[in-house]
């Protein structure tokens, strides 16, 4: 796992068009807004979260965020243990995000 500031996160995403963004917040949090094109996978859903991860291509880069950066760091750690090659955590999470977002 690599910790990225908002600026680094944006530049890494631009340079890696095959990458995937994952939002690990709760459904209630997501309803307040989310980063465009993010895949929602609630880390609090336990086995459902793990099952969802098992369906993903472990060779791609994953940019993970939550509300403040703690749950996404946990998610990146889990992903690393499952054999994902490249995970990035957004420091400060969605609270610090000033980039484009959408309301589902």
PLM feature spans:
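Rhodanese-like catalytic fold shared by cysteine-dependent sulfurtransferases
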Residues: 1-20, 27-61, 70-104
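Short, surface-exposed ligand- or partner-binding patches at beta-edge/loop junctions that are enriched
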Residues: 65
């Amino acid at each position: 796992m690599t910790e990225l500031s908002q600026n680094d996160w944006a530049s890494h995403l631009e340079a890696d068009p095959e990458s995937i963004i994952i939002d690990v917040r709760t459904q209630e949090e997501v309803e307040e807004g989310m980063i465009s094109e993010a895949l929602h996978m609630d880390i609090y859903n336990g086995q459902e979260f793990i099952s969802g991860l098992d369906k993903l291509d472990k060779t791609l880069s994953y940019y993970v965020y939550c509300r403040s950066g703690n749950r996404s760091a946990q998610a990146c750690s889990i992903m690393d243990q499952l054999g994902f090659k490249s995970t990035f955590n957004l420091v400060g999470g969605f609270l610090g995000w000033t980039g484009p977002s959408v309301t589902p």
